[in-house]
Amino acid sequence: MTKSELISKLAERFPQLLAKDAELVVKIILDAMAKSLARGERIEIRGFGSFDLNYRPSRVGRNPKSGEKVHVPEKYVPHFKAGKKMRELIDSSHKQHNLLDQATG
């Protein structure tokens, strides 16, 4: 799902919202989440999942074209962990999909 699709679904679900208002709501939420992560804060949305930062130490990597060794500096990367309800929903959905594939396969 893209940001545009999310905005469209929000506008469909809430007809009283104009498309530009739905777009603004999505933008405000995503900006707030990005700023929170940039401050090093953890984001938890119960039933959906949590976002936090993982530390990656510096290391020696390789340039894929030349094979030359390259220093890769330390960094923090965003990490998402799905909540229990989401994991269960995804798992049951894929199990049903696999059963349908086997039945028609």
Swiss-Prot record:
Entry's Gene Ontology BP terms: DNA recombination; regulation of DNA-templated transcription; regulation of translation
Pfam family, one: Bac_DNA_binding
Signal peptide (UniProt feature, chain positions): none
Record flagged with keyword Transcription: yes
InterPro entries associated with the record: Hist_DNA-bd, IHF-like_DNA-bd_dom_sf, IHF_beta
Any one GO molecular function term: DNA binding
Keywords (A to Z) from UniProt: DNA recombination, DNA-binding, Transcription, Transcription regulation, Translation regulation
Matches recorded under CDD domains: IHF_B
GO CC terms in record: chromosome; cytosol
Keyword DNA-binding: yes
Quaternary structure annotation from Swiss-Prot or TrEMBL: Heterodimer of an alpha and a beta chain.
Family recorded in the similarity comment: Belongs to the bacterial histone-like protein family.
Task performed by this protein: This protein is one of the two subunits of integration host factor, a specific DNA-binding protein that functions in genetic recombination as well as in transcriptional and translational control.
Protein name: Integration host factor subunit beta
Organism: Nitrosomonas eutropha (strain DSM 101675 / C91 / Nm57)
